[in-house]
């Protein structure tokens, strides 16, 4: 409540201020906060609001989200002393020894990182080696944010390699030579991009960050497929810029570097979803002489001529249509 009236020297807060700013829209914190800070916050808010009916809220927080913990294996020497991961050396991935005297150590199960158990990673060392973006990407991609995650150096390396691919993709688009344009191919590309942006935007709003990152992996492959297609540089650049804006909450350093590569104003608004560009698709069963030979995903508004063309090049239906005319 005090944060709502920080400059008030006479009172802890004023009614106008707290009624304007409170309640907090979203509270994000670990489970341990639910039994300490949250409990006291609710207690004081309920107590104050009982004695002053002009306060127009009874709960301090509208929504609560509790994130999981980052976990790591624990290590003990034969005397029962806890050891840091940097003090041990793994052999064949099954057992480990103490670096200082080569004695065998006891491997413990993964537990939330703790100073007392020394199962922590030096963040400065990891950031120096891989960058903050790679670490953030790994943590967000490994599992749903409300679940605990198992720390993995291999996972961080993998995240770092993917982010390098994203940079290379942006560079290739910035240096790409213009292709002859096929409007239909371009239309399909724009439609698919609108679907991706819609999914990512929805997942961010629902705290499904791991789902977002899965979409980014799919987006990367999608862009790679269209690099050598008949899509204009303008359309490719416009959409890769939108993708990098979507990546800002996840990997801000890389995203801003890529946006500068495209000479884009990084302060522009969040990408907007043009739902008119999302083409509805239907499943079309291809029957030949009364038997289903294939099932195709096609746009709902295709003409009969366009459908026939798609069917004629279907790998499953082609052998039944060779040297024959399609009647209906």
Q: What residues fall within each predicted segment?
A:
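Broad structural signal for hydrophobic residues in well-ordered alpha-helices, predominantly aliphatic
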Residues: 47-48, 126, 246-247, 258, ...
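Acidic, turn-prone loop/beta-hairpin segments
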Residues: 64-66, 70-89, 178-199, 214, ...
């Amino acid at each position: 409540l005090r944060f709502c009236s920080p400059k008030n020297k006479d009172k802890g807060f004023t009614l106008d201020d707290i009624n304007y700013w409170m309640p907090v829209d979203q509270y994000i914190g670990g489970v341990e906060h639910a039994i300490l800070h949250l409990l006291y916050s609710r207690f004081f808010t309920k107590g104050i609001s009982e004695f002053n009916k002009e306060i127009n809220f009874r709960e301090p927080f509208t929504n609560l989200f509790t994130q999981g913990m980052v976990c790591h294996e624990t290590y003990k020497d034969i005397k029962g002393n806890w050891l840091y991961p940097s003090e041990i050396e793994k052999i064949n991935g099954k057992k480990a020894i103490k670096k200082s005297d080569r004695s065998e150590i006891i491997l413990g199960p993964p537990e939330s990182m703790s100073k007392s158990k020394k199962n922590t990673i030096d963040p400065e060392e990891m950031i120096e080696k891989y960058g903050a973006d790679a670490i953030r990407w790994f943590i967000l991609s490994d599992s749903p944010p409300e679940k605990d995650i198992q720390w993995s150096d291999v996972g961080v390396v993998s995240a770092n390699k993917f982010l390098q691919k994203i940079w290379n993709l942006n560079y290739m688009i910035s240096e790409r030579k213009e292709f002859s344009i096929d409007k239909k191919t371009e239309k399909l590309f724009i439609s698919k991009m609108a679907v991706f942006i819609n999914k990512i935007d929805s997942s961010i709003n629902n705290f499904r960050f791991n789902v977002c990152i899965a979409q980014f992996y799919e987006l990367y492959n999608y862009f790679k497929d269209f690099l050598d297609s008949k899509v204009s540089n303008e359309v490719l650049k416009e959409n890769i810029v939108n993708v990098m804006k979507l990546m800002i909450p996840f990997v801000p350093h890389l995203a801003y570097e890529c946006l500068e590569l495209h000479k884009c104003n990084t302060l522009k608004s969040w990408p907007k979803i043009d739902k008119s560009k999302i083409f509805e698709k239907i499943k079309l069963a291809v029957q030949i002489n009364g038997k289903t030979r294939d099932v195709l995903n096609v746009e709902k508004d295709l003409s009969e001529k366009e459908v026939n063309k798609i069917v004629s090049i279907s790998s499953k239906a082609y052998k039944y249509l060779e040297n024959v005319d399609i009647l209906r």
